């Protein structure tokens, strides 16, 4: 689910659901939130990366389907937990570096927007893909708006994919390697 490794003062967190492109479900959301809430005094930075061929595909569609049968109160509680995960990235007391490769869609872009530094491979592909599912990226919006401002409007509405170079142009990506 989540690989945690401490090395030379850096906490490495690996999203480890490669069979679903590291898509979020309740367990991964809880694991990432807990890990970021347990920063040790010796930790000087956090690196979040995806295992396998993708950084993060956003929400797991099977998990999202299950949510469609929940009550409004249950859905609100799940949305709050998701927000708290992004907020844990954003408010982490040490710098958070997102190390992006491959696809980074929806909520994956939320992690990127909440991170302090984003290092992306030149082959990474980003998209705020919620619109393709008939959804709005409400939970990640506060973090994305802080990071890229007015660029978010077009990207949210069109769900158009963009490469790491464009991500750097608009301020989502810090450096492309």
Model-identified regions with their sequence ranges:
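Conserved CoA-thioester-binding segment of acyl-CoA-metabolizing enzymes
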Residues: 1-51, 87
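Terminal peptide-recognition signature
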Residues: 13, 17, 32, 48, ...
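Residues at secondary-structure transition points
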Residues: 19, 23, 30, 59, ...
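Phosphate-coordinating loops and pocket residues in cytosolic domains that bind phosphorylated ligands
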Residues: 23-26, 57, 66, 157-158, ...
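A general structural signal for well-ordered alpha-helical segments in protein cores
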Residues: 29, 48, 61, 82, ...
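Glycine- (often His-adjacent) and acidic-residue-rich active-site loop
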Residues: 42, 50-88
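Crotonase-fold acyl-CoA enzyme core
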Residues: 88-177
């Amino acid at each position: 689910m989540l690989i945690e490794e401490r090395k030379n003062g850096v906490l490495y967190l690996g999203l480890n659901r490669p069979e679903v492109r590291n898509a979020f479900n309740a367990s991964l959301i809880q694991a990432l939130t807990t890990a970021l809430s347990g920063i040790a005094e010796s930790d000087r930075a956090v690196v979040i990366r995806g295992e396998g061929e993708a950084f993060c595909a956003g929400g797991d569609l099977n998990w999202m389907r299950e949510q469609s049968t929940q009550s409004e109160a249950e859905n609100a509680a799940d949305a709050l937990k998701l927000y708290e995960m992004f907020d844990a990235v954003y408010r982490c007391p040490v710098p958070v570096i997102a190390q992006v490769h491959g696809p980074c869609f929806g909520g994956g872009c939320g992690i990127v927007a909440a991170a302090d530094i984003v290092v992306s491979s030149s082959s990474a592909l980003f998209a705020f893909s919620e619109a393709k599912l008939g959804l709005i990226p409400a939970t990640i919006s506060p973090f994305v708006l802080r990071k890229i401002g007015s660029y978010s409007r077009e990207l949210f509405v069109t769900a158009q994919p963009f490469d790491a170079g464009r991500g750097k142009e608009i301020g989502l990506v810090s450096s492309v390697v």
